[in-house]
Amino acid sequence: MAPPAKRAKRGWVPPGYKYLGPGNSLDQGEPTNPSDAAAKEHDEAYDQYIKSGKNPYLYFSAADQRFIDQTKDAKDWGGKVGHYFFRTKRAFAPKLATDSEPGTSGVSRAGKRTRPPAYIFINQARAKKKLTSSAAQQSSQTMSDGTSQPDSGNAVHSAARVERAADGPGGSGGGGSGGGGVGVSTGSYDNQTHYRFLGDGWVEITALATRLVHLNMPKSENYCRIRVHNTTDTSVKGNMAKDDAHEQIWTPWSLVDANAWGVWLQPSDWQYICNTMSQLNLVSLDQEIFNVVLKTVTEQDLGGQAIKIYNNDLTACMMVAVDSNNILPYTPAANSMETLGFYPWKPTIASPYRYYFCVDRDLSVTYENQEGTVEHNVMGTPKGMNSQFFTIENTQQITLLRTGDEFATGTYYFDTNSVKLTHTWQTNRQLGQPPLLSTFPEADTDAGTLTAQGSRHGTTQMGVNWVSEAIRTRPAQVGFCQPHNDFEASRAGPFAAPKVPADITQGVDKEANGSVRYSYGKQHGENWASHGPAPERYTWDETSFGSGRDTKDGFIQSAPLVVPPPLNGILTNANPIGTKNDIHFSNVFNSYGPLTAFSHPSPVYPQGQIWDKELDLEHKPRLHITAPFVCKNNAPGQMLVRLGPNLTDQYDPNGATLSRIVTYGTFFWKGKLTMRAKLRANTTWNPVYQVSAEDNGNSYMSVTKWLPTATGNMQSVPLITRPVARNTY
């Protein structure tokens, strides 16, 4: 083997990268993109090879193969070049001989984890016994001598690994209960949040989440195209807004969706993040499934009484697929409140996976007491040009799990823009330098005065010879008016156009300011003591004072400017358009343009969606209303699960239905969401507003909402996200 190599302190990297290149330093900060992150892990692995006395530059190693796997779908030029470079190296370079590869946090392929041969458990059990005896003796010596034990952390972790591997068939998992179980009990139940302070004000937040998921067999083993056409509602004149007409493809699969803040963080975590940090971004996501349990249900008639018998089924299987290439329709479950539950100690369920299918919809626009009948209230038939029927079985690699098996997705790296956790108060009227005072007040109750408007210096865009605060030019437009209560029509039917959420400036104007109305059930924050079919509802008002729209007091004036204006020279909120009552300029007026600045929609804890998939169109929207983070490349692959068909001996391939054994399953889902935040600098003299619990039982922040009752009832309403103000100019 060639002599050990030495890592250079400085190397060469192409523009736009920090680690993608030979011989560079390992402390260049955050990688610029997923390919650069893969290069960083590759460099770290090379560093471990070099420290162990090996030369990875002349040999093809496991680190090289990992880099190839991580960059196989790279869209950037550097990732593509690096990918093919190491593929070429693999073809010509000899393989690096090593007993153990250095571990990194690289992306691993999604798949089932295979179990070692049985003889390994025997050998490791012997090693465990020997290690335990040695550790006990060492512990006794250390405690009696009063000396510290070097590398105690590594020793503990090594012992834990041996113990987990030694459990084997019939053993407990990770130090659990005694033997008697089936398969290997794996994994750990962890819902902690860790904060690692990196320096320069940056914080790495690692949110761990675990849920017990219950899974029934699907209602049908078939894919079904189902039509919904609520003609009872839409046949009534003026009921266009109640239209539900659509077609959907119902699949026999279920979606395991963790894309909601309440899955990952507890309320006090959100309070801490929003009170102390100024911005937040996503880094990576890992998911796994373990401790799969599959059972069958049979009924027996004992003395005229039906009794259900539950048995473990060691041959039944659960099917798992991850749409890592985003082939299937993207259906985030937070929008319908069907993500995994928010309470780690309560079992939860997966959401049935279904997606829209193209069908035309023709619905007439009508109004109350209109004469005649509703002429158009029809749905079309599938069109060959637009029909897209996707099946999981034909688009995904499916892993089969049986009792005791486990599955891991590997690591996904986000490419998103950070979101601010502070709000802005500066409107256009508060940008720049205030007018010059001509006199100062002589008492605390007095007001200052300004130079006469006709004598002031300044700029306006009006053809008048005076300057006021109302007509001064400002550098940009903060926030913007936009049409609200605007229903557009597509070939699929009418829909309400989305609005950028803004702070409420008038209490009765929630719809005009884009407030979001959440309706949710007990798994996602509803009071568990509630009864009846109606869900709990909460209207989320954005905290962004600078972009609030006060539609009641806006107006438009004709040119040239005349003060005071005549009736025919001004359009106010009180003036109807045409001869209509209560339809005004704010319903059609839009001031969005190249001069417009506005805040990003804030995260909404706990019910809000976290990330979203970018629309596959040439021109992208600047933001999404449904989630604060939009993935610039593929979004994390949707995880889909279902129970494999468990048939009886009466199977008829020509029958309309399948004769199935009643089967259900449970499994533990575990995820790790890594985020990066920036600590908020303290800049003001005055104390700032903070998210804080109160003891007032009727207040919004009453602590009793997040405390259990005597019977365990819980509630979790949305928490404020941006409590602290910031300067924007």
From Swiss-Prot:
GO terms for biological process: clathrin-dependent endocytosis of virus by host cell; microtubule-dependent intracellular transport of viral material towards nucleus; symbiont entry into host cell via permeabilization of host membrane; viral penetration into host nucleus; virion attachment to host cell. Residues 168-184 have a biased composition (Gly residues). Residues 1-38, 96-115, 130-185 are annotated as: Disordered. Residues 25-35, 143-152 have a biased composition (Polar residues). It comes from Murine minute virus (strain MVM prototype). Mg(2+) binds at residue 325. This is Capsid protein VP1. The capsids of autonomous parvoviruses expose a proportion of VP2 N-terminus and part of that sequence can be cleaved of to form VP3. Capsid protein self-assembles to form an icosahedral capsid with a T=1 symmetry, about 22 nm in diameter, and consisting of 60 copies of two size variants of the capsid proteins, VP1 and VP2, which differ by the presence of an N-terminal extension in the minor protein VP1. The capsid encapsulates the genomic ssDNA. Capsid proteins are responsible for the attachment to host cell receptors. This attachment induces virion internalization predominantly through clathrin-dependent endocytosis. It comes from the Viruses. Its main location: virion. The keyword Magnesium applies.
